[in-house]
Amino acid sequence: SELCAVCHEDIAKAFAKSPHHLVDIGKKQGFEGRACEACHGPAEKHAESADAAEVRNPGKLTAAAADKICLSCHLNQPTHVGRLQSSHAKDQISCTACHKVHANGPDGLIARTPAALNAQCASCHINVWTQFQKPNHHKVPEGAMTCVDCHNPHGSIRPAMMQSFGSNEPGCLNCHGDKRGPFTFEHGPVRFEGCASCHEPHGSANPRMLARQEVRLVCLECHANLPTVNATGTIGVVPPAFHDLRSPRFQNCTVCHQKIHGSYVDRDLLK
């Protein structure tokens, strides 16, 4: 690496501030003895001729080939084991699309402030970012949360690269632990379909971030006995428990069914 720094002084100065520099100067992480050539390959011919063709440039490789270099060290890290099966990998989004290999501070190879990290995700996921502009949303634009609080950008066994906690529980329960259970009386969709079967995780017109503007519309996606149209064309004549949904008192399910995530005492989730 000292020989490389003779010509690549600017990169060497940036590299000195990078966690990868520990690979070169110490034995932390067990990566000792792997410096510039760990990523750029044998560089003896390049050092003699200064010919760029004589050294490997990961930035010019395919995403899969570049990732192979990174994963030669990082694949066994717990947060990276799903990388090869992740949607980022399948979409040819390489490690270096997010990480700056030579630069950045001692805590990582990516912007660490919430605003900068979220902006990096938003630069690709524009459609998701627009959902945060809805009136009810997780406080990501405000910087109180980051995308990686819920998602593992390196890959996950869960859909949408969701973070897993404990026994592969969805990341939602890391904050909303009161909804975890186990409950004596379970609400099936909560246990088997997940939070997103009812909620919009990024933003919603509903104060509780439901997938529909009104709670009854969410409930009726499962709890509707079809057909529910009578001879006069009225919808909702045969709803669950024979409630008449034409009556205003039956149009907000959670007035009575307050424990919709699960209950310890009531099979109908009333309390």
Regions found by a protein language model. Give the residues of each.
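Short sequence/structural segments immediately N-terminal
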Residues: 1-271
